[in-house]
Amino acid sequence: MATNNTQNLRKSFAKTRSTVEYPDFLDIQVRSFKDFFQIDTPAENRFKEGLYKVFAENFPISDSRDNFILDFIDYNIDTPKYNVDECIDRGLTYAVPLKAKLRLTCNDKDNEDFQTIEQEVFLGNIPYMTERGSFVINGAERVIVSQLHRSPGVFFAQSKHTNGTKLYSARVIPFKGSWIEFATDVNNVMFAYIDRKKKFPVTTLLRAIGYGSDKDILDLFGLSEEVEATKANIKKAIGRKLAARVLRTWTEDFVDEDTGEVVSIDRNEVLLERDSIIKEEDINIIVESGSKSIILHREDVNIADYTIIYNTLQKDNSNSEKEAVEQIYRQLRNTDAPDEQTARDIIHNLFFSDKRYDLGEVGRYRINKKLGSGMGSEVKVLTKEDIINIVKYLIGLINSRAVVDDIDHLSNRRVRTMGEQLYSQFSVGLARMARTIKERMNVRDNEDFKPVDLINARTLSSVINSFFGTNQLSQFMDQTNPLAEITHKRRMSALGPGGLSRERAGFEVRDVHYTHYGRLCTIETPEGPNIGLISSLCVHAKVNSMGFIETPYRKVIDGIVDVKNQPVFLTAEEEDGAHIAQANAMYDDNGNFISDRIKARYEGDFPVIAPDKVDLIDIATNQIVSVAASLIPFLEHDDANRALMGSNMQRQAVPLLRPEAPIVGTGLERRVAMDSRTLLIAEADGVVEFVDANEIKMRYDLTDEDRLVSFDSDIITYSLIKFRRTNQDTCINLKPVIQHGERVKKGQVLCEGYATDKGELALGRNLMVAFMPWQGYNFEDAIVISEKVVRDDIFTSIHIEEFELEVRDTKRGEEELTSEIPNVSEEAVKNLDENGIIRTGAEIKEGDILIGKITPKGESDPTPEEKLLRAIFGDKAGDVKDASMKAPPSLRGVVIDTKLFSRPKKDKDLRIKSKKQVETIKGKYSKDLLALREQMIEKLAALLDGQTSQGVKHKFGDEVISKGVKFSRKNIEANVFPDKNPYRDESNYNVQEEANLLGDLIIDNWTSDKKINENVLRLVKNYLTKRNETAGKFKRERFTLEVGDELPAGIVQLAKVYIAKKRKLKVGDKMAGRHGNKGVVARIVRDEDMPFLEDGTPVDIVLNPLGVPSRMNIGQIYETLLGLAGKKLGRKYATPIFDGASEEEVINELRDAGLPTIGRTKLVDGLSGNPFDQPVTVGVIYMMKLGHLVDDKMHARSIGPYSLITQQPLGGKAQFGGQRFGEMEVWALEAFGAANILQEILTVKSDDVVGRAKTYECIVKGENLPRPNIPESFNVLVHELRGLALEITLH
């Protein structure tokens, strides 16, 4: 039975009904990755998405003569060589082998002997996501952060010229291809820009895409009236304006000197310009020009609206489509086009070719939505209609009939999830691979070759590895605590390739926008230069297939909330124009609002409206914020700036040795701990068979059907993580919370640890607090803490540091790990084993040898003294030097683990021995597979007993068991598991059993019973999984024997030492609450000196009351008082944000606990024993210890390293550097007239090389200090001036 020791039950103060479950908080990472690989989807059912789409876009590949064609059929991934833990230990990448099935065919009639070849080809090892949504790259966990960037599509903007004229522009941003921009200028002319550089009138572009004449262009906007060019008609038109030029056109013939051909060229001469008013004398000119008609301005249209078109036509020098395309070619290439077709092709390739230009599904959707065009989503290129509609929309903007876009609106920004980023990297890798395949095909003429001969696996894996290792969005995972992990995986960054840069990002893009509501957290963002550029996804938000962030709402129809149906998820664009009620608007069980006035949101406004005007309602009060901000109780009483700090500081809380869940929580603590994937969760109902500190064995309740299709044992073993180091050197150590024989329910937590307590997130401890000054020690946010907190290990944490040493093969010989180190005392090596590695359990301090290593010295002639010493003490000590790893300054701890990885020696006897061992494990592997096969035959026979076959087919179409035949053990064994697979070459496999037929069969509709077919599918899937696991294990064992541990080139051995440091709370450590109330421990006071309650209970912590009013984080006071009541009553509370306990409810809890309801208590001074004059706010507050520990920062230097050039001491603790005495500090000493101290600091303590050596000598001899010399920095200055040919001498 589940006991209360495995669960915290909380009293909730929530008033709103929240029937909607939280989504999986890691869904954005896990689902994106699964959708990219489509692992669980059979090849024939895969969507043209993710990896499958990349292959489809790059294949088929053919040579330049189309003789050979390489087609893509399918891809699959094998099991990884090492599991996640092994990769972390060995510093390897957790990756899976990617294999593609390719078909090579030949169309060359001269090469009829060539057989079509299908082959599975290895494309490289691809980093694979762990269950926790991270990647292990070179032994370190990393996260791919999602990127927020501008959505593809069309954007309309407005700017102002310096003279005050409004300028309008439209920019089309594609996924792939050239940008095109349309913009107006101060002269009211519209230009088109291609790739932000080449500019020409927009009418030139319109002519180039098929609207060649002035009449065609004017007709697009309904501006022209065509009149037949007769004398009578022209006479009637006298006094009206021409809308198009009157041209005289003729054809000229000339002989091409190169070819001798006669070539015709059309010529134009402008007789009358646009906007000319027709006069009497123009009649004959028009008639004689040979023009069939003239184009006049329409009199029924307001010409002023279209002035820009007329102005642009005036600027346009071209008169036909041919002239326009040639003019654009000249602009783009800075040279004349060789012929008209080349000029046309360049326009086509820029915007109308799907090979060069791609708007993507999103871009097409955005353009259709904006311009109201009805293009199908399959049209991924720009169309003529798009260009015309954009020009029309711009004219509408100029005439104030349309609105510009808000670039910060979330409909114009989309998320590039990890899957999409991988897609673009694979596209680059496969495009490179396609080029090399093409080159190799062209080289191989009529000779036999296979697909594997064309492919270089390194091409793809180098691109992918460089992305995971160096890309700005592939980040070292923040693993301080489970919340830090979850937040990092849910992060949205506007930085990175193709995004913003923090230098260029202005205030608007960083600011909160009304569309962020329910999508991006309005609170959680960094405080530094990245403020507003890095955000976090809200708790209920999700990213849709197009990359837009959606948030859920309940529909409200005629003032009644739809409580029966599931909420609808809406993007920012879909939500525009709707009145949305807040989640705390009360309604009854039928959905009728209780109040007749409802507070609502309408885009960026907040009206109070009648219920029947409401369209939607929020589903939860914490919908507006992220996971971290949702964990702050009484957030509604805190200033946003402090809440931001509270959110960020929870991520820095170090996991404690004895964590404790908060008394006052928000109800989300359990969900965060579960979704972090840190804890072990029961997969089904069952019983605990065995439990100890290292493992838990569970026997789950399985049905006979489940047992039949499973190959696993009934008992499942879970290993608990013990003292594992995280990326931030904190410690994961899990311990069981269930007991032997206990019955558990599905979803129940089996262990705790790593900042969790009974399945809930526990980042800190509940402490008895008093808000009062104490002897001035809590001035300026400093904290006074009781000795009891230190003594009882309340804030003690364990930190694990990893030290590694590589043994290399150098030019002078191989380095060696040993405990026999020259010139070192026996005392120093007493804890080293024979490999020179310190023993587990040894206590170490700074300067101790952790790993003993010797390196060969350079060969040089020894002096006579050395020869003598060698003769006496042996040859060993002379030719090697000590290269051991020593404990760095300030390190004190206990060795908890050591590891040694080695590459085996290439010895003949060892090779023979390992060959025998490989044969042994190969035999065992073959036996295991045969046993599995036998088990599978038994299970299939039992499942299909008495059933009639509906036809068991091979995927090539052959029938293996004919339709109508009854299944039996005999025909299953003979036909499904024959001794030889006729479709596969068994020489390609390790053992014959690997090539069995089952994997090639269509596992579909073997019988007429649907249920049995489903079970056959499950059974075959489980069998193939088990077979792959067995194969993976064999490959790993064989690899270990043949190759040894995988180590980088040139490294023979790798030794690792893990040291655990127990960090008790100290003066100087940083602590914080959840409301942005941070401070540094200033004094640890004895229990008896701390202020105490009237019953004698001393408080644990004293905070300064002045830290509350100016910071406006009153939430901490509410938390303090409710925490006090909870402690007295033995209750834990859930007070969800914006829906938590009211002032009255807090008072009621205090009353129930028999505590003063004013929230203040009489306190007694521990030092004097006298009561304080005024009552003090005393309660229980949740405090965390942050990662900024004084032990990591404390540093002192006596003698240390100097910079080579300036000869000044280095800076920083890592370099064992000094404290910089800067310009302002020098002023301070000058102001005091402390000349000698100043001289000493600027010379012998800094860069007076000779002076500091002499000073040391004088101190040793007890003499007076010498006069300082000239500092080295003066010499550096002199040398630099000499570089400018200026000679300076110092006297």
UniProtKB/Swiss-Prot annotation:
Keyword line: DNA-directed RNA polymerase, Nucleotidyltransferase, Transcription, Transferase
GO process annotations (BP): DNA-templated transcription
KW Transcription regulation (keyword) present: no
One Pfam family in the UniProt entry: RNA_pol_Rpb2_3
GO MF, any single term: DNA-directed RNA polymerase activity
Any one of the GO CC terms: DNA-directed RNA polymerase complex
Reactions listed under catalytic activity: RNA(n) + a ribonucleoside 5'-triphosphate = RNA(n+1) + diphosphate
UniProt cross-references to InterPro entries, sorted A to Z: DNA-dir_RNA_pol_bsu_ext_1_sf, DNA-dir_RNA_pol_bsu_external_1, DNA-dir_RNA_pol_su2, DNA-dir_RNAP_su2_dom, DNA-dir_RNAP_su2_hyb_sf, RNA_pol_bsu_bac, RNA_pol_bsu_CS, RNA_pol_bsu_protrusion
EC number of the protein: 2.7.7.6
Keyword Nucleotide-binding carried by entry: no
Top-rank taxon: Bacteria
PANTHER family in the record: DNA-DIRECTED RNA POLYMERASE I SUBUNIT 2
Record HAMAP family: RNApol_bact_RpoB (MF_01321)
Family designation: Belongs to the RNA polymerase beta chain family.
Free-text function comment from the UniProt entry: DNA-dependent RNA polymerase catalyzes the transcription of DNA into RNA using the four ribonucleoside triphosphates as substrates.
Oligomeric form and interacting partners: The RNAP catalytic core consists of 2 alpha, 1 beta, 1 beta' and 1 omega subunit. When a sigma factor is associated with the core the holoenzyme is formed, which can initiate transcription.
Listed name of the protein: DNA-directed RNA polymerase subunit beta
Gene symbol of the encoding locus: rpoB
